[in-house]
């Protein structure tokens, strides 16, 4: 016997009037006398299945009444047009085959707290909003790779276990590596991807990255996914232009492919429809000045309307500062040329201003903060070695990385985009933990 259904719900529109066999899970069920209404989901869509007692055998009607939330089943019937349905059709049921009858499903239609839902994350992902979020995530990942592939970037996988730090030593997860000492979970794939840049010219890696930050904010996870392009003969302006086109492509893909998901999430898509190049750009110096002007004017920051805190030149921005600066524009905002002391060792100094580096953060609108960090990389071996020493790192650990500057070095640039932050912004969800199937946080590693 074939186990596959005759079609998936999403493909049913062209088969109205035909007899079909659908397979899935009971999302919701209501009974009204001689009628049973079953909301059946199969992962592609949800359809209403109507069981008329007069149209089925007593056994089939009994099975319909027996079904419980999240029971799995096959449902046979005829597709019928119905303007009231979000799909435009529903299923008149003729037969039901129960695969598994669920008992006491823990996530009932009543309201549940976040703690409870996170402890049942393996089941919560079945709910409509979580399903929509994760479909958007899948489209973001697909679009990101599709765009880079179309621009002649080659996927170049980087290791998860590394011998050295890439962004600093304070937030590394360490593990023993046989007799060779400690290995670390990768903070980024960038350093390794730079080796591929000299091989293919344009490369990217995609995978999980790890930060042992003791942070409990809605923007932070200890494990998150990054896509990190790197390309040769490219400066900071080339880098920002690539990011503009890259992000705009992803946004359009989500608008085109996730219309129903965005509706489920009640996302105001008008705020996404104008995300097209060029994006506004301001320097770090200009950003500090705008913050000082905001403080002087008594500016407050959403969502709590807390007073905007002052900053001095050389300070890094906190989440409220990013939110305030982004609120001054209606598109993602580039802030470029940050102070050297707040950025990583591998960033190229600005010409004539060694106190700043040629980098840029891309800040999403609506308070979602930084979604991309990028820079032009140092391509001079002596300068790079000096920067490694300044950051208190062991030069011996980076000889392989310095080799990339000793043999055919060229100006090059790259960036990293956090998938979860991008998904949270596009979906309009306030907490990053819902933008990944199984979030890892300071106080959560289960399930």
Swiss-Prot record:
GO terms of biological process kind: asparaginyl-tRNA aminoacylation
CDD domains assigned to the protein according to its UniProt record, in alphabetical order: AsnRS_cyto_like_N, AsxRS_core
GO molecular function: asparagine-tRNA ligase activity; ATP binding; nucleic acid binding
Catalytic activity: tRNA(Asn) + L-asparagine + ATP = L-asparaginyl-tRNA(Asn) + AMP + diphosphate + H(+)
Enzyme class, broadest EC rank: ligase
Gene3D superfamilies membership: Bira Bifunctional Protein, Domain 2 (3.30.930.10), Nucleic acid-binding proteins (2.40.50.140)
Family, similarity comment: Belongs to the class-II aminoacyl-tRNA synthetase family.
Organism, as annotated: Herpetosiphon aurantiacus (strain ATCC 23779 / DSM 785 / 114-95)
Known partners and oligomeric status: Homodimer.
Keyword entries, A-Z: Aminoacyl-tRNA synthetase, ATP-binding, Cytoplasm, Ligase, Nucleotide-binding, Protein biosynthesis
Top-level taxon of origin: Bacteria
Pfam families: tRNA-synt_2, tRNA_anti-codon
One GO location term (cellular component): cytoplasm
Protein name, as recorded: Asparagine--tRNA ligase
Gene: asnS
EC number from the UniProt entry: 6.1.1.22
Predominant localisation class: cytoplasm
Annotated localization: Cytoplasm
């Amino acid at each position: 016997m074939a186990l596959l259904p005759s079609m998936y719900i999403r493909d049913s529109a062209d088969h109205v009037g035909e007899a079909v066999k659908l397979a899935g899970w009971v999302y919701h069920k209501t009974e009204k006398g001689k009628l049973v209404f079953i909301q059946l989901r199969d992962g592609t869509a949800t359809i209403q299945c109507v069981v008329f007692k007069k149209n089925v055998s007593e056994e089939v009607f009994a099975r319909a009444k027996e079904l419980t939330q999240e029971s799995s089943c096959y449902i046979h019937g005829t597709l019928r047009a119905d303007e009231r349905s979000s799909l435009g059709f529903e299923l008149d049921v003729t037969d039901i085959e129960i695969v598994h009858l669920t008992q006491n499903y823990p996530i009932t239609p009543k309201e549940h707290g976040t703690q409870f839902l996170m402890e049942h994350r393996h089941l919560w992902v079945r709910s409509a909003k979580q399903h929509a979020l994760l479909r958007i995530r899948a489209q973001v990942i697909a679009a990101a790779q599709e765009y880079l592939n179309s621009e002649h970037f080659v996927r170049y996988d980087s290791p998860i276990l590394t011998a050295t730090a890439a962004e600093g030593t304070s937030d590394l997860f360490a593990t023993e590596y046989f007799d060779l000492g400690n290995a670390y979970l990768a903070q980024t794939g960038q350093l390794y991807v730079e080796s591929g840049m000299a091989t293919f010219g344009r490369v990217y890696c995609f995978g999980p990255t790890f930060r042992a930050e003791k942070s409990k904010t809605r923007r932070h996870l200890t494990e998150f996914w990054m896509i990190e392009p790197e390309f040769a003969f490219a400066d900071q302006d080339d880098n920002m232009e690539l990011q503009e086109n890259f992000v705009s492509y992803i946004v359009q893909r989500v608008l085109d492919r996730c219309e129903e998901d965005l509706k489920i999430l009640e996302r105001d898509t008008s705020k996404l429809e104008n995300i097209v190049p060029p994006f506004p750009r301001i320097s770090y110096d200009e950003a500090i000045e705008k913050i000082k002007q905001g403080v002087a004017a008594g500016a407050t920051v959403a969502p709590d309307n807390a007073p905007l805190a002052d900053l001095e030149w050389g300070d890094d921005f906190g989440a409220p500062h990013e939110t305030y600066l982004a609120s001054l524009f209606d598109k993602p905002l580039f802030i470029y040329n940050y102070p050297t002391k707040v950025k990583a060792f591998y960033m190229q100094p600005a010409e004539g201003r060694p106190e700043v580096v040629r980098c840029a953060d891309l800040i999403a609108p609506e308070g979602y903060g930084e979604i991309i960090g990028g820079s032009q990389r140092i391509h001079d071996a002596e300068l790079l070695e000096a920067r490694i020493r300044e950051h208190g790192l062991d030069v011996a650990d980076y000889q392989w990385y310095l080799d990339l500057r000793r043999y055919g070095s060229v100006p090059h640039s790259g960036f990293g985009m956090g998938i979860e932050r991008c998904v949270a912004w596009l979906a309009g969800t306030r907490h990053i933990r819902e933008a990944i199937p199984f979030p890892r946080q300071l106080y959560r590693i289960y399930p």
